[in-house]
Structure formats: structure tokens, C-alpha cells
């Protein structure tokens, strides 16, 4: 157990009742695992619409436990949100629910505006009313989990994004997240609602839906399918292991200041092609049943994503200095853990490779202009 995790166990004992939106999704489910493990006395209510990327089985470890409850529903449903806040006496919202895949946002932006902007607005309105009705308690928190993509794209020479970097989103996805960030910030400045925003870099780890880069490559290796790499493969991303992200969010809820924004990054800038080659080497080492070996032979360059941001990089010195958080898992260790998880959990991802997923995959990677 690292020092930050030890530190968390010593937080003053104030029981929290959390509403975790999108808790059946990738980051949300990992956060629920973290919170229920570290704070078993707290109550956790998950609200998730169970869209294609939400999977109730991600939360199987907690189903039936006294302090855990799952509710299927939409964050845009104001009466449902009101009912949950009042009935369950929620004091903390951890807001993960979002449409999050850039390629899908290019194919169909409407769902992104609806969930990410209107959904966040609905939660803010409901939580503001609830907070006021309870006498505006100091310990209430609205944590809005967002992305570094709101800052736009960097050249290889630019300094990393800080919390002061101006917003310049380039995709319908990042524009919708930027819109939601602005609403959250406005509710703090206008109404003093105790909101906090976090902007993270690319997450990876267990329970990530197969459309995302790292699980996509692992699964395609196992199926002997091409490993599609956009453009020239030189796009750079900063990779954050999801467990490290959850530790940071824990600290932000307990010690972060309302009205503040915290950037959360892994300090792991890697070119896409280098990442794919690292994954190929891990698959060759760890998987016994590869149809094609070496896996690197499957790498196929495909037409670049529309408006593909060249580089993301996060300066996470604020959260390091103010809250004492730094990432504990190196990209080498994190990738190994992740590959091992996908190899051991085929029964988790195989049902997700549905006809709809295949149609979407073909549309993105095989329809070359």
C-alpha cells in the first residue's frame, strides 16, 4: 500500500453518501471498487443508464451489499435525480456519466450534447436545490470528472496543459465536455455550489470497453485481426492508470477546495505507434494462443481520424503540490497489469463484441476514403 492510500485511511471519520453517475462504466466502476474497498462504512448509490459502454457486471462484487445500491436511469431524468438525492440523502456526487469516445462523437454528436451538457446541467440544478434545502452544508461536494481534451491539441514543443490553459476543444466530444465544465464552474461562481472539476489524461486499465485503443489492440491480437493505427502513428498521449486516477479523485473529494480545478496526468507521454508496439511485445510474452505471432505483423496504418489532435500532455504539479498526489503506476507496469486482466477476463469482453459493435468498428476503421 503506498503512502497516499495509507493517508486516505486516516481521513476524519465523516460518513459520506455518494451518488456515482456512470458507475457501471470504465472509470466509474473502478472508482466504485476503490471507494467501497477503502471506505466500507460509506454508502454508494450508482446511477447508470447502461448504454452500450455501461455494464452492470462490472459492479458484481458489490451487488447485494448493505451499503451499495444500483439504479438504472438517465441523468437527464430530473424527477428521478431529485428522488434519489432526497430519498438517499446524498451529500456527494461523483459525476462520471458521459459519452466519451471521440470517434463516436464524429459519427453522431447529438448523444454527446444530450448526456454531457444537458445531463450535467440537470444534475447541477437538482443538486443545487437539494443543497439549499439542506441548509447549504459545507461538506457537500459535486465532483465533475472531465478530460484534458477540452484544452485542445499541443505541438511537440508546447509545454503541457495546466489548469490555466485556455479551452480550445476540437472534437464534438471535447466540445461537449468543455460545455459541461463551464456549467459546473458557473454554478460555483454564481450560486457557491461546492463543485470541483478534474481534467484527466487518457485512462487505461480493467473494465475498459473494447473500442478504446489499449483493449482494442489486446483483443485484436487474440483474434488475429489487424491492429489499426491512425495516420502515421506519431500522435502522442499521456497515459494514466485508472487506479491512480481513482486515488487522485479520492483525495480531491476529501481535501480539494470547492471552485478549484485539478489536472490529473500519468506523466507518461507515449507515441501511439510506440504504445501499440509495447502492447504487441506484452501479448507475445503473455498470451499462449495468438493466431499471428509476432503480433507486430498485424499493425496496419489507417486513414487518420478527422481533426485528430496531435498531442495531449498534462502538468499535474498543482495536485502534487496541494494534495500530495503523484501517479504510482508506471506505464510499463500498468500495461502489463492491463494485458494480464484482458487475458484472464475473456468472458467479460467477448459478449461485448456484438453485431452493433462490429458495425461501428467497420464504419470507423474499414471505410477508408
Describe the predicted segments one by one.
Residues 1-203, 337, 345, 351-369:
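N-terminal Rossmann-like NAD(P)+-binding domain of SDR-like oxidoreductases, especially those catalyzing
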Residues 3-4, 10-11, 18, 31, ...:
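C-terminal substrate-binding subdomain of Rossmann-fold SDR/epimerase-dehydratase oxidoreductases
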Residues 50, 202-205, 235-236, 305-306:
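Short histidine/acidic/glycine/proline-rich micro-motifs that form metal-
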Residues 54, 92, 146, 182, ...:
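Generic alpha-helical secondary structure signal
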Residues 56-59, 154-157, 208-211, 275-277, ...:
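Short aromatic-enriched loop/helix-cap "lid" or pocket-rim segments at secondary-structure transitions
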Residues 80, 111, 118, 209-213, ...:
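Residue-level recognition of oxygen-bearing side chains
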Residues 132, 143, 150-156, 192, ...:
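Proline-centered turn/helix-capping motifs that create local helix->coil transitions or kinks
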Residues 158, 169-176, 206, 210-214, ...:
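The catalytic Tyr-centered alpha-helix of NAD(P)H-dependent dehydrogenases
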